[in-house]
Amino acid sequence: RQRQMCIRDRGIKDNVEEVKENLQAGPSLTAGAEPREEGSMVLRTEDLVKKYGKRTVVSHVSIDVKQGEIVGLLGPNGAGKTTSFYMTVGLITPNEGRIFLNDLDITKYPVYKRAQTGIGYLAQEASVFRQMSVEDNIASVLEMTDKPLEYQKDKLESLIAEFRLQKVRKNKGNQLSGGERRRTEIARCLAIDPKFIMLDEPFAGVDPIAVEDIQQIVWKLKDRNIGILITDHNVQETLSITDRAYLLFEGKILFQGTPEELAENKIVREKYLSNSFVLRRKDFMK
């Protein structure tokens, strides 16, 4: 089902019932989907608030991501970035505020319905089917799209070639390296032709030598006019490929701007990056 594709239950302690409700998948990744508007789309949040009892963990957070750009969502532990990210994904319901895809209010949409509107989600934890081959992992998503069989076959071969999975296409999910697994997960997510992809800790569990490979893949998604929202504790790896970034601190947005602007801001360096931080952009971006 859809929840097994680009969706994973993060098992958030305070939101078990919300997650269960949000992961109630419908019959198809395309059935009942809202029509996508032509041109550049914008995914945005307006004044999101999340409270647990008397404690406010996110206070009036507004962010936006346009198609064809990579946006980082950063912050120290306890800053509210993960909660803000999960509200945008649809795993957590905000107490206040709204989430829009262009002018469509998707605040109450469960994750599977957001996928139908063109929002893909790649969880931090491994989401490949461990006992299925790489090609079957991808094909299982294509089968849910209601596309013609010939299209599904062509799309499968295209994704396997693009993500250099030819040598491991028959390997089961539990036989893949961290980098191979990530490439398979991204390829599978692209099977539904998303307009946006939410990346949760994409560099976690990946060997250092494979990190740049994943960065290049994410960067090239811009060529598909896909908007990317990344949240990751690996600040250098994230800022090195983002167009813009938001820094959350104590539940609020402390700063937003380009990676260069963040790296040069005195308050950001004092509270988060440290004075020794040096931004290193990737050569493949030039």
For every predicted segment, state its role:
Residues Q2-I7:
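Short, small-residue-biased leader/transition segments that mark boundaries at the very start
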Residues K172-L176, E180:
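Conserved ABC ATPase signature
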Residues D193:
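Conserved catalytic motifs of ABC-family nucleotide-binding domains
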